Amino acid sequence: GLSFLVETEKSRILFDFGAGKAAYDNACKLNIGMENIQYAVGSHGHYDHAGGYPEFVKEGLHCPLYTGTGYFEEKYARDGRKATYLGCGFNEAWMQEQGLEHRICDGYLKLESGCYLVGNFERTHDFEQIPDRFVRRLDDQWIKDDFSDEICMVLDGEEGQTVIVGCSHPGILNILTTVQKRFDKPIRAVFGGTHLVEADAGRIRATLEQMKQMGVGLI
């Protein structure tokens, strides 16, 4: 998992929250007060990116939470008959109890000038497949998780755009291609997880080559 603090000219944005208390402890060491964070963004509903959110809330984070659709769905990893819960550990009802506002990015949402959330990624690269073990529980049935809840953040810059991703379950190239089509601007840098841990050498080479063709110079 991960947790980034992104500072723009206008705001501080907390992008993902880690799995537990560690990300909040890091914020304390950096003397970052929760009252000084204007936006909280959840890339997707897995525990290692979302599980630390309640800790931030307990310590005073009360800005709106921005996520994709389906962030609170029950997510699991299945291995035969064994299913391991991977979800965020809280839900919409808990948000309401805490008096927190939840805002949905349904494909595109502008946070502020030069800062955007993007989701609903086109699946244009066939070799970027989601492992079958990732599933959701819906109406007492197991359904393959397509990670339609995943979103990324895009920042404008003088030399091009910076894309911040959480885990890239839908495929890093699918994400970047969708971003390029929406904005028609060069992508200068990519920060975050690419989920290539299980990829073979051929897929990694193909991914890097296509990212270079897109103009990405910093990963």
Regions from the PLM with identified roles:
Residues 45-49, 64, 143-152, 156-219:
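Cap/insert and terminal regions of metallo-dependent hydrolase folds
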Residues 17-20, 45, 69-71, 115, ...:
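Active-site metal-binding loops of divalent metal-dependent hydrolases
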Residues 10-39, 129, 134-136, 172-173, ...:
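Pre-active-site segment of Zn-dependent metallo-hydrolases
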Residues 22-67, 72, 183-189:
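Active-site metal-binding motif and surrounding structural segment of the metallo-beta-lactamase
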Residues 1-30, 146-164:
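Conserved beta-strand hairpin/beta-sheet module of binuclear metal-dependent hydrolase folds
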Residues 81-90, 95, 107-158:
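Active-site-proximal loop/helix segment associated with metal-binding centers of metalloenzymes
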Residues 62-106:
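Hydrophobic alpha-helical segments and helix pairs
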